[in-house]
Amino acid sequence: MSRKPFLLGSLVAATAVALLAPVASARIKLATLPVRERVEIQLENENATLVEEERVVTLLKGTNFIDFSWSNTSIDKNTIIFRPLQVADKVAVINVAYPPNENALVWEVFAKEAGAVKVRISYLVGNLRRTFSYRATAEVDESKLTLRNYMRIWNFSGEDFGLSGVWAGFGEAFQGKEIGLQESKEVLIGKFLDVPVQKKFLFNWRTGQPVPEEPFQRYVTMNYVLKNSAGGAAGANALGQYALPYGKVRIFLKDGKPGMAAGEAFLGEDWGKFTGIDDEMKLYLGLARDVKVERTVKKNERQKIHGNLFNQDVIVQYKMQNFRKDGALLDIEEDMNQLRDEFCGGGKDHEASWELQNETTDKAKVERKSAQKIEIHVALPGRPKEADKKPDETLFLLHVLFKNEW
């Protein structure tokens, strides 16, 4: 008789045990595993998926052999655990045997009394994984959005799990999901309403796209920025309940044209980074060609200290114009190690030691994101209402002293 693909009792093994066993062990029989009563799939670890299943097994008084096989299924045999439930010390596993050259094992189980026993079998399985995605729909005024979080389950493990409970490692578990063989299924695991969002404009001299024929300019990028904290709807529809996993985000904007049916315009898509509680997620929308930033160096002086040791006094000027009707919040990113290398020479094997100096336009607008990264926050006014007037220029000076360089 051929072994069935997965988790079936082997009547052949039962016959072999009966023939090889001495007369005194004639009561020893092989228990056939019945169908699963409950299956739970836990997907919190991206490298290993835990499966727990419960069955009711009928045991004879004395020693029983229970066969467990997993042909063509990606189970890690070193992780398989058999646990009797709600029987205290009346049932115990006394031995585990692994038949050679087979994807199988045999539990030797001792029962003080005959009867039906609920058991839980758990194991790690491969090729059963999950990915995450999002759908962000912004309101017409772009002040709030609705964020939906989806999980897609991919089952290429070699086993049909049927109706199962599924847990992503956060949020609520889902019951009664059909997890079939060679199947993928997407489920909505979170819907967050009225999430506050800011439309920000970002300038980065080193990563920004160059502007043709403008050597001192880089294109500004547009981003939606949302914070993973409870700042919107209350209760189950609030952000900040768990860290948001990495995944693709599709971004839409509600169409608010008067006299027309409500619709949504597709703005683009971006990869949302892993976002912890109280951290920010930035979603790229595209280039902002109506916000101009020009970066120039106003001061670059070296101050000798001793030998080859020196300080470098630097002033960088940012000249900004906003051609949009509405005001804009501009973030200017600078990496202080890279800024130091720009003026002190590259190839440094140490972190920059730096201080803001007095000629900085407004030190309160310079936020330290880390030891060596800063963001300058500048609010730009909208363009004048008069068509013949140009937007005002906004200037910001960043005055930095790099200390003890060589």
Enumerate the predicted regions with their spans.
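Long, intrinsically disordered, low-complexity accessory segments associated with secretion
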Residues: 2-6, 11, 15-406
